[in-house]
Curated annotation (Swiss-Prot):
The keyword GTP-binding does not apply. component of the regulatory network controlling carbon source utilization through ubiquitination and deubiquitination involving creA, creB, creC, creD and acrB. Involved in resistance to acriflavine, and required for normal growth on a range of sole carbon sources, including fructose, cellobiose, raffinose, and starch, and reduced utilization of amino acids, including GABA and beta-alanine, as sole carbon and nitrogen sources. This is Ubiquitination network signaling protein acrB. Residues 733-742 have a biased composition (Basic and acidic residues). Residues 596-753 form a coiled coil. The lineage of its organism: Eukaryota, Fungi, Dikarya, Ascomycota, Pezizomycotina. Residues 722-732, 1005-1015 have a biased composition (Low complexity). GO terms for cellular component: membrane. Its main location: membrane. Keywords: Coiled coil, Membrane, Transmembrane, Transmembrane helix, Ubl conjugation pathway. Disulfide bonds: none annotated. It is found in: Membrane. Residues 35-55, 126-135 have a biased composition (Polar residues).
Length: 1015
């Protein structure tokens, strides 16, 4: 029957009690040995039910010792329940409840036959002191030396390093492989099933780096190894891996100072420097060149140097297997150093006091016990300072998880610093314990539960005590016969635990070192009903639930301790009682002191008393409510009875009730008779019943098949109905979509119709406007035609008058020519003398006479009168580009530069072309000269419009010609263009009238007009 994982972990971590080496520091003396010798070796099993631990007496001799040993090996346990058995084992170890913490150490055998050990609590302190003294004196130095090894981390580390450096390469590679594989193993504090969890794979167990961290560090160190390290550095790093293995196995890293690490690294560095060929050549060459050592002396003593130091060739690179192992070991060493330094930085500085604390003892007391509870999968509670167990429900989950992580981390850190020798000793202890455990199991009933019936036939002369049942507040036990052969009567009176019985108890009970009063011990008066080995039965009451107790059984006559048992009471089943008991703030893993035990018992008794009082009060209240309810019903019935006035009705009701009672009694009697008659069922009726039953079953099958068909039909109908409903829904949706689409199309159609109607109205409005515009244009055209007619009439009048004027001018010109011909020639060749000119004397002489004297025979009058026009619009044409209508007009003559026959002909005169075509000033311009003057040919040409052109088209042409690329109407002279031909006609008419009236007119163009201008 294998032991639980918690047992294996805890027994592996017990180094202080089973030969494990310390951390290198000398432990100081402890004031209380109970702290060191408390319950370290207890185990937490996985079985349910009570647990017990029995310390068997060791004062037997001869056959009694052999029989006792056999009985102890096959120690039976009386159990009242199959799942609440306890089993005693040699050495004080037992298998029990998972919430149980055992606490017995192996006591030494004293010469006087007493049982030595810290668990032997006696009322007589002197006897206890004597037993402890004799127990300590019984351990000789050889036994102590063979059990406990002295911790020498420096010596162990250096010895292991020297041993590793002397190993062959193949063996050394195997050692490195085994050491490297240990880094991937889960720590002993981790449960077997938790290695596959995400926490342990990716986060890493407490106290060790995670798998991802190890892989990352290995990859980084491998990159540095391949890129930056030469051959000598690789070989040096390979030996540094040996140093790490030696430090780990020898416990060199347990101390606070790094002296061991520096010494080992220095040894390896010196060896590599001495073995280096380059350094040897440099040192020898320097010594020889400096003439410190002669070559002859060097060759004479060179044989003293080991052959392996004489390198004739450079070192070769190590193999890739050894390189990978060395890289992994060094990477994990660096990670461990970094984690250790961070842990030291987070850890607060210890208090400065003169007292030196035993670090190994404190680690063994707290850390080792924590290691038994470090697996959250196997342990879900812990003990309080008074021995009570605090479950996970009584503590916050986050604090519990943090404390569990901290305990695992501390346990793994202490375990990682454990020296190699301590590990070997702990392994030896674990192996021996498992061997004893398996041997004890082989002698029992092969894993079957042991009961009191199994003790029959076993002779126990000196008695035996064992636990039979454990409750939350009571412990029941049974004992054998303690009467000796020479004394058949009780010789003493029990100090405590006495009951009202005629027979005196041979022993009394001490709980946690305190005599317990609430113990009931009874004797078996009828040995035939019980086992022949059971003489006494007892019950220890007044205990607190969820607490650990050490029950000692002491003889009344000699005050000798028979045995001691470590028992833990289970938690209370009653939720109210469990809530009434306060939870301890600090967990503890050993039994409490007598005072604390009594206080806890008193508190438990008071809690039970308060609970019973509360239940009593609750029962009283319930009874009061029930009584009040019954009283109300009684009053109701009384009122109804008193209010009943119809006696006939009451009589009929009573007769009916009597009739019902009589019928019920008759039916009951008939049923009784039928039951009596059916005592023996006939075979024919049985066969008929079988047939009817078969028929019933067939009908039932038919009914089931019909129901199944109905269900199938209903399902098919429901399916068809659902499909039809879905089709109906889809059709309805499609119809709704079509309706919506129809609505949208109708709205669009209405919008189009309204838009068309609006467009028709717009066309009608535009047509009306166009018609009105055409009417206006026709009216305007009619008015223009009327104006044209009037203008044409006026033009004809002007032409008549002009012809008359031309006739007059012709006559005047002829007269002037005749007069000039009649005058004599000048007396001098230079011309007329000053003062002799006829023009000054006769200003009324027409200019036509002067024109006859010019060599070109050009007339000044021809430059003043334009030709006649047949239309009023022909005045826009230039007189230069048109033929004269009058035969005597001088316009017919070509316009060229005249040449004089006299030497003075080239001189400028008022008759030259510059004078003839002289521009008029802007301050003296007549309407006729502005309209018909030859100085504005471009402007006149631009203003010329053909006859019969629409005025609107003329306006459009004017608008088109008003751009940048069109010719302006005012011409280059900068004159304002004439806005309308009607205005020009009017001005011409006015000018004509003024010319006819006198010589001062501005529009006639007559010589008098010219003279007027000249004046």
């Amino acid at each position: 029957m294998p032991r639980s994982s918690a047992t294996a972990r805890k027994s592996h971590s017990n180094r202080q009690d089973h030969g494990g080496g310390g951390s290198g520091k000398k432990p100081s003396k402890q004031k209380s040995s109970g702290h060191l010798n408390a319950t370290y070796n207890g185990t937490a099993g996985s079985e349910t039910g009570p647990s017990s631990q029995v310390d068997w007496p060791s004062h037997r001799s001869g056959d009694q010792s052999i029989a006792a040993a056999a009985a102890k090996s096959n120690g039976p346990v009386d159990s009242l329940k199959a799942d609440t058995n306890g089993r005693g084992y040699p050495g004080g170890y037992a298998k029990g409840n998972a919430d149980m913490s055992y606490g017995q150490t192996n006591g030494g055998v004293s010469p006087n036959g007493g049982l030595a050990g810290p668990a032997s609590r006696r009322t007589d302190k002197s006897v206890t002191g004597t037993k402890r003294t004799t127990s300590n004196a019984s351990v000789n130095p050889f036994q102590l030396a063979s059990t406990i090894l002295r911790s020498c981390p420096m010596y162990d580390t250096i010895a292991i390093l020297i041993f590793l450096l002397q190993l062959p390469p193949m063996v050394l590679t195997l050692v490195q492989f085994l050491f490297a594989s240990l880094t991937f193993m889960p720590p002993s504090g981790t449960a077997s099933g938790s290695f596959t969890s995400n926490f342990d794979i990716f986060q890493g167990p407490a106290g060790t780096p995670s798998l991802g961290t190890m892989i990352a560090m290995d990859g980084f160190c491998l990159l540095v190894w391949g890129l930056f390290m030469w051959t000598w550095a690789q070989n040096f790093a390979l030996d540094l891996a040996h140093v790490q293995v030696a430090i780990t196995l020898g416990g060199g890293g347990a101390g606070k100072n790094g002296g061991v690490n520096a010494l080992c690294v220095g040894i390896v560095l010196i060896l590599h420097l001495i073995r280096s060929k380059g350094i040897q050549d440099f040192v020898v060459g320097h010594l020889v060149s400096a003439k410190i050592i002669s070559p002859d002396l060097l060759s004479h003593y060179s044989y003293l140097m080991p052959a392996e130091f004489k390198r004739t060739e450079s070192q070769s690179s190590p193999s890739w297997i050894r390189s990978l192992l060395a890289v992994h070991i060094l990477a994990q060493a660096g990670t461990a150093m970094a984690r250790r330094s961070m842990t030291k930085n987070r850890t607060p500085a210890p208090s400065r006091s003169g007292k030196r604390v035993d670090t190994e003892a404190s680690a063994g007391s707290q850390t080792q016990i924590d290691s038994a509870f470090e697996s959250a999968a196997s342990v879900s509670s812990y003990l309080g300072p008074d021995g009570q167990i605090i479950t996970a429900a009584h503590k916050d989950g986050r604090d519990r998880l943090i404390s569990a992580k901290k305990r695992r981390r501390q346990a793994n850190q202490v375990r990682s610093r454990q020296p190699f020798w301590a590990a070997l000793a702990s392994t030896k202890v674990t192996v021996m314990r498992e061997y004893e455990h398996s041997r004890a199991l082989s002698k029992t009933a092969r894993g079957l539960a042991t009961t009191e019936d199994d003790l029959q036939g076993v002779s126990l002369d000196d008695g035996l005590v064992w636990i039979t049942y454990v409750d939350s507040s009571t412990i029941k036990f049974a004992a054998g016969d303690f009467a000796s052969s020479d004394d058949h009567s009780a010789s003493g009176v029990c100090e405590a635990g006495r009951v009202s019985s005629e027979d005196a108890e041979p022993f009394y009970v001490c709980v946690n070192g305190a005599p317990w009063a609430t113990v009931v011990i009874t004797k078996e008066h009828d040995p035939s009903k019980a086992s022949n080995t059971i003489y006494w039965r007892g019950e220890i009451s007044g205990l607190a639930p969820n607490c650990a107790y050490t029950c000692s059984f002491v003889k009344c006559d000699t005050d000798e301790e028979i045995c001691a048992m470590s028992v833990k009471t289970p938690a209370a089943n009653d939720a109210e009682q469990a809530n009434s008991v306060p939870a301890p703030p600090q967990p503890s893993y050993r039994p409490s002191s007598p005072t604390t035990t009594l206080k806890n018992s008193i508190i438990n008794a008071e809690a039970k008393l308060n609970e019973k009082r509360a239940r009593l009060r609750k029962a009283k209240n319930d009874h009061k409510l029930a009584i009040s309810k019954i009283k109300k019903e009684l009053d109701n019935y009384t009122n109804r009875l008193q209010s009943g006035t119809d006696e006939n009705r009451q009589k009929q009701r009573s007769l009916q009730l009597e009739r019902n009672i009589r019928q019920t009694e008759e039916a009951t009697a008939a049923l009784d008779n039928q039951i009596d008659n059916l005592g023996n069922v006939p075979d024919d009726e049985y066969q008929e019943w079988v047939e009817q039953k078969a028929k019933y079953e067939r009908e039932l099958e038919l009914l089931k098949s019909a129901k199944a068909e109905i269900a199938a039909t209903r399902t098919a109908n429901a399916r068809e109905l659902s499909s039809l409903e879905s089709e109906l829904n889809s059709t309805t949706q499609r119809r709704e979509r079509l309706q919506g689409r129809r609505t949208r199309v109708n709205e669009q159609y209405e919008r189009i119709i309204s838009a068309n109607a609006q467009g028709l109205n717009e066309r009608e409005r535009r047509a009306a406007e166009q018609f009105a515009r055409e009417q206006d244009q026709s009216k305007l055209e009619q008015s223009f035609n009327e104006q044209f007619a009037s203008i044409s009439q006026s033009v004809q009048d002007y032409q008549l008058r002009t012809s008359q004027l031309w006739q007059q001018c012709t006559a005047v010109e002829q007269a002037l020519q005749q007069q000039l011909l009649m005058e004599p020639a000048p007396l001098t060749p230079e011309g007329e003398l000053p003062g002799t000119s006829t023009f000054a004397d006769a200003p009324s002489v027409p200019l036509g006479t002067l024109a006859s004297n010019m060599p070109s025979h050009r007339s000044l009058l021809g430059q003043s009168f334009p030709p006649l026009k047949s239309s009023p619009l022909q005045h826009y044409a230039s007189p230069i580009g048109t033929a004269p209508s009058h035969p005597t007009s001088p316009i017919a003559a070509p316009s060229y530069q005249p040449f004089s026959s006299s030497p003075f002909g080239n001189a400028a005169s008022f008759l030259d072309p510059d004078f003839v075509y002289r521009d008029r000033s802007f301050s003296n311009r007549s309407a006729r000269s502005s309209l018909y003057g030859s100085e504005f040919p471009d402007a006149i040409t631009a203003r010329r419009v053909p006859f019969g052109v629409d005025p609107f088209e003329l306006g459009n042409e004017k608008r088109r010609g008003s751009g940048s690329d069109s010719t302006p109407l005012n011409g280059p002279s900068g004159l304002r263009p004439i806005s309308s031909p009607f205005q020009r006609a009017a001005s011409r008419a006015s000018g004509t009238g003024s010319g006819g009236s006198g010589g001062s007119g501005s529009g006639s163009g007559s010589p008098s007009s010219a003279r007027g201008k000249g004046n």
